[in-house]
């Protein structure tokens, strides 16, 4: 009798354990199937994203990446937020991701650099960035810099009274505040005591030129380069024999501008000789403004240059050297005019320079230098800068939309 009772209890316990185990197995299988559906839906989202980037144009229809899988994929523009939404559904699992348009948050300043600038000869600001309007006038900004700035020669900021308007819609009759107008006869440096620059020259330790201009962090610059708006130029190519050949930067730029490709991303060191500067000037003035962005290399112009547009020099990892300037035939000129700076020079303007728009220099090392020999004249134009930054706008995934909380 006792044996029967014990056997019955053991059987009941076994059946209970079996049911529990079966339940756990079934639940695990369901969870796996659910996760498989979720992963398939995520794959569908990635399929849609691959068809949206790098052109950043919504396709008329989404091509099926794998017709053996039952995944429904959609890609559309949210009319309220202007976010691009990629979504996919597999069985009962739905996944969606949002991409928001990166916007420029550029600070005031006609010329901006995360490094340092040296100018020999005269500096004329025909039209500064108006900056912030207050009751008494405008807090105008000519230069914004992170490193140091020096001018050997005369310097004058004419303000807003005599030069062209900073944009087409600018109707204000107010002038730059007197404390935002610099006039210097002789040498002036950001380290001078007493202070020789007025408040139109702003030293900014938090300046991040690339991110401020494009709305994209420096380390994600490939998003901007591949956004479909820039025409990319690679100045060094490898032959079938394995040899490296260097293209003429000025010739490549002219070729693209003549094809109406106005926003150029130039990879490698670029020297634009005097032979091309007149044609570049004419083509830029016939447009709403061009963008010349030189990335990871030294940048130089030989001769008098005049450009309507945005000049952008962006070095993230590149380190300039005397040997590199020598290889490009510019070493002797830099050594003659800036003998103490040739090892850290990243940009060199060998002749007078005038720009209508803006100039931006973003270097990883604040000690790297942009050097200007001969006269430098700037006319800030907000419309030209906006044309450049908005043309290069890129979509980035929206924070919180990709498990990046």
Predicted regions located by residue number:
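Compositional signature of intrinsically disordered, low-complexity segments enriched in polar residues
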Residues: 1-39, 43, 49-405
């Amino acid at each position: 009798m006792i044996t029967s009772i014990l056997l019955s209890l053991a059987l009941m316990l076994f059946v209970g354990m079996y049911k529990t185990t079966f339940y756990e197995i079934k639940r695990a299988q369901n969870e796996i199937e659910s996760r498989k559906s979720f992963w398939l839906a995520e794959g569908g989202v990635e399929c849609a994203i691959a068809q949206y980037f790098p052109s950043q144009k919504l396709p008329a229809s989404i091509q099926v990446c794998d017709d053996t899988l039952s995944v429904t994929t959609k890609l559309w523009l949210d009319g309220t937020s202007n976010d691009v939404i990629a979504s996919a559904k597999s069985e009962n699992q739905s996944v969606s991701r949002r991409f928001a348009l990166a916007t420029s948050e550029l600070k005031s300043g006609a010329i901006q650099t995360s490094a340092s600038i040296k100018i020999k000869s005269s500096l004329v600001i025909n039209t500064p960035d108006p900056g912030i309007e207050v009751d008494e006038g405008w807090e105008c900004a000519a230069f914004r810099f992170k490193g140091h700035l020096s001018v050997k020669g005369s310097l004058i900021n004419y303000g807003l009274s005599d030069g062209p308007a900073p944009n087409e819609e600018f109707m204000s009759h107010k002038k730059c505040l007197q404390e935002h107008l610099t006039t210097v006869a002789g040498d002036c440096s950001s380290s001078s005591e007493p202070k020789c620059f007025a408040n139109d020259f702003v030293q900014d330790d938090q300046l991040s030129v690339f991110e401020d201009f494009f709305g994209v962090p420096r380390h994600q610059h490939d998003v901007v380069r591949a956004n479909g708006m820039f025409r990319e130029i690679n100045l060094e190519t490898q032959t079938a024999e394995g040899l490296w050949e260097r293209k003429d930067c000025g010739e490549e730029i002219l070729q693209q501008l003549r094809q109406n490709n106005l926003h150029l991303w130039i990879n490698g060191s670029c020297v634009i000789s005097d032979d091309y500067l007149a044609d570049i000037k004419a083509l830029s003035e016939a447009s709403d403004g061009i963008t010349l962005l030189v990335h990871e290399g030294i940048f130089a112009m030989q001769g008098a240059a005049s450009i309507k547009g945005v000049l952008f020099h962006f070095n993230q990892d590149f380190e300039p050297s005397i040997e590199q300037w020598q290889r490009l035939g510019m070493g002797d000129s830099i050594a003659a005019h800036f003998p103490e700076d040739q090892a850290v020079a990243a940009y060199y303007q060998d002749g007078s320079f005038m720009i209508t728009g803006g100039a931006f220099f973003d270097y990883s090392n604040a000690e790297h230098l942009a050097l200007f020999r001969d006269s430098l004249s700037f006319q800030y134009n907000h419309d030209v800068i906006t044309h450049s930054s908005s043309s290069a706008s890129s979509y980035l995934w929206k924070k919180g939309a990709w498990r990046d909380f």
